[in-house]
């Protein structure tokens, strides 16, 4: 049974589709700027508020001393916008989060995102359900930095031992919270990590 007064959720790949954002970044950046280490760019844009999508990638490339043409920036934005159209909220999400709220639970969210892919929380109306929402680019740090989990727990008014975090990535949503004293639960709908003991394949299991 999964019960708590406090829950923290990941966003992409847990509440909404789009866990492939970093793969999409990599393909887009490697295609347009061969040799660029996309992971460094991800880390940079995920921890800074840089404005529009085009401005965001432009500043990131400038930071890494790479000159981009207007055509390259336009193409990158087209790739991002095409990807955005495919993102949707998982069917069971509203039932689960409303069910938890009815039980008196306080809900938090921690998401590694940037100006480039911001806006999905508002698009799907998720903000009304969550007591605390932490976006990496707004606070200048990203998962798995321990401080971002500590910030969310503090804002929830909870103790580490009282909190359950649910997400689809072991290295960001499960193992770091466990080390801090929370309970990290892996959301694994495709059962890719069947060996992992503390996991769920459907968010509705949180209501069991």
Locations of the language-model features?
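N-terminal helical cap/lid subdomain that shapes the substrate entry/recognition surface
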Residues: 2-95, 99-103
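Asp-based, Mg2+/Mn2+-dependent phosphohydrolase catalytic module
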Residues: 1-7, 17, 69-71, 94, ...
């Amino acid at each position: 049974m999964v019960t708590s007064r406090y829950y923290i959720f990941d966003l992409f790949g847990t509440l909404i589709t789009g866990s492939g954002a970093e793969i999409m970044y990599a393909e887009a950046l490697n295609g347009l700027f061969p040799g660029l280490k996309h992971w460094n760019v991800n880390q940079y844009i995920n921890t800074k508020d840089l404005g529009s999508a085009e401005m965001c990638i432009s500043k990131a490339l400038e930071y890494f001393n790479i000159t981009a043409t207007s055509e390259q920036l336009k193409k990158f934005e087209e790739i991002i916008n095409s990807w955005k159209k495919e993102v949707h909220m998982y069917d069971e999400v509203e039932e689960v989060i409303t069910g938890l709220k009815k039980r008196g639970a306080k809900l938090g969210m921690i998401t590694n995102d940037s100006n480039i892919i911001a806006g999905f929380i508002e698009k799907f109306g998720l903000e009304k359900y969550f007591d605390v929402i932490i976006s990496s680019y707004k606070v200048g740090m990203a998962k798995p930095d321990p401080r971002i989990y500590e910030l969310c727990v503090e804002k929830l008014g909870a103790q580490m031992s009282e909190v359950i975090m649910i997400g689809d990535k072991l290295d960001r949503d499960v193992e770091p919270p466990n080390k801090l004293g929370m309970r990290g639960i892996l959301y694994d709908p495709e059962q890719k990590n069947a060996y992992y003991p503390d996991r769920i394949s459907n968010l509705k299991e949180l209501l069991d």
